[in-house]
């Protein structure tokens, strides 16, 4: 091939180097030319607004997929970690993964376009997305926040917030929205008086005690609990791969996979019925 490899091809080739024997690689300079083993099963992770390092999360994913491939009898499994749906979309189009790990909003938002079917759920310690809260320093009820400034880094998908997170308790349009980019920035907006209230998740509320001024902030509303991680198959996934993954899904964090799950905070993967989230899907789809 004479064309210069794309940055995506280089990244995938580097990941493949973790999954093939060292004898297949002649040197670091040749990593970009190493092809994925035939039969490699593709994965993607889309964890929106997750805390922690994306590069660390990628290393945990690589280790977990290496363990899964061994357990499932696949030649290899590889995947990529994303924090934005927009960036994940290009990867999906180019690599056509079979499976994914999604935050709940990402799953609902990407489900129809990709033919996603829920296979399981998992807990994710301290990574957020399992419950949402409205917090304030001055207000003591949700109604007292309405019409006031509301900071949030969870407002990218207003539909998810309005029809799933809020449970019809509010719409983002009920507030003067102050969009933030980072989890801690959202909390500090309330502490510093830049916003009257804020919409945060369980990971953010757990950090209040560690942030200067956080003790003065309190929740005025809490959502219902929801799955932190949805494990799903893509519509294009071969049936044989789906059946094999289903057999090993609940053992993801056992054996060689335990260390990667522990490091990533992933716990208790368990199967669900394909229609487990039918109500939320119907609400989101309108």
PLM features per residue range, with description:
Residues 9-22:
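Bacterial N-terminal signal peptides
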Residues 21-30:
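Signal peptide processing junction and immediate N-terminal pro/mature segment
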Residues 31-108:
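Extracytoplasmic small-molecule ligand-binding "clamshell" domains
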Residues 36-50, 124-134, 213-253, 259-286:
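Periplasmic-binding protein-like
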Residues 46-70, 105, 128-188, 192, ...:
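Bilobed "Venus flytrap"/periplasmic-binding protein-like clamshell domains
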Residues 79-90, 176-188, 225-227:
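Short helix-initiation/N-cap motifs at beta->coil->alpha
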Residues 82, 87-145, 156-158:
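Acidic, polar ligand-binding/catalytic clefts
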Residues 101-114, 191-219:
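A ligand-binding cleft/hinge motif common to bilobed small-molecule-binding domains
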